[in-house]
A protein has these predicted regions:
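Domain-level signal for soluble alpha/beta catalytic cores
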Residues: 1-300
Length: 300
């Protein structure tokens, strides 16, 4: 369905990047290093991942939405997977297998997104490096994605401009559609203090506006900047259920799943003000209840 990417239509696309918190807190699954891709190595792990994806697809199907299935590869890059004992060859196999697993589950009205995360902790302090450093680092995983049936590459929870630029350039090298999702703090700014609008503009300027579109994830609607709905290059919001800060969420020992109906109403209000905002979904603390509530509120 690569000819039907979200920026080419006004249809509603429903996605979910909250699988890890769903797995840990609702399904009782242990995820060392917060990585879900190792679950694919066992029958039990594959079964529980299948259940998460099946719930998402059912939620979208109930409201005639297009589903974006994110591969469980957010932590499947070199530095983040190293503590799990994966060498380069094992990690390559894991990434390719993860996208294949999701593709095998896909039905009609489904997009396959090869999901990648930042080189370092998305919420921790990090010294910015040259975009070329991030390009070379992420080119490995993006190159593996190029060998799969993924419709696009989606970078989630990116927190500064140089890494976003490097990722997009690496995807551009291989002519792969790429989506860039920034995260913002409770004040609406990127963790390094950059305004979202400035981040989008600077990344576009440095990459020839190659990204298909931008998004925000791992943030509650209350935390968005006032100009959010005016940013037409930002076509998606994958929201947290909780209003807590990233620091509080990192230290949480219990799940804050918020109010699904309230979250759905908030995203529907944003979509009403910004019709270009057509990729919606749930991040930390969300599950199929939130996805149904979002679709119900938006399409009511």
């Amino acid at each position: 369905m690569s000819d039907s990417l979200p920026h080419l239509t006004d249809r509603l696309y429903l996605t979910h990047t909250g699988a890890e918190t769903d797995l840990i807190f609702r399904r009782g699954v242990d995820l060392p290093e917060f990585a879900s891709f190792p679950l694919l190595e066992t029958d039990a792990g594959r079964a529980v991942l299948s259940a998460v994806y099946a719930d998402q697809m059912a939620a979208a199907r109930g409201f005639d939405c297009v589903t974006i299935l994110e591969s469980p590869t957010w932590m499947a890059n070199g530095a983040r997977a190293e503590p799990l004992g994966y060498d380069k060859a094992q990690l390559q196999r894991a990434n390719i297998a993860a996208v294949a697993f999701v593709a095998d589950m896909a039905g009609a009205q489904t997009l396959i997104s090869a999901n990648l995360g930042p080189m370092a902790d998305a919420y921790g302090p990090a010294a910015h490096q040259d975009p070329d450093i991030y390009h070379d680092y992420h080119a490995q995983q993006i190159g593996w994605f190029a060998q799969t049936a993924a419709d696009m590459v989606s970078a989630y929870t990116v927190n500064h401009i140089p890494e976003a630029v490097g990722i997009i350039r690496a995807a551009q090298d291989l002519r792969l559609p790429v989506v860039m999702s920034f995260t913002v703090e409770t004040n609406g700014y990127l963790p390094d203090g950059t305004p979202l609008a400035a981040a989008v503009a600077q990344v576009d300027q440095q990459t020839g506006a190659y990204a298909a579109y931008f998004m925000v994830n791992c943030a509650h609607p209350d935390h968005l900047p006032p100009d959010f709905t005016a940013l037409e290059r930002v076509r998606g919001l994958v929201a947290n259920a909780s209003r807590c800060s990233h620091a509080d969420l990192d230290n949480a020992t219990a799940l804050d799943d918020g109010d699904p109906a309230e979250l759905g109403a908030q995203l529907a209000a944003l979509r009403a003000r910004a019709p270009h905002l057509n990729v919606l979904g749930g991040c930390c603390g969300t599950d199929a209840r939130h996805l149904r509530a979002i679709a119900r509120a938006v399409l009511a």
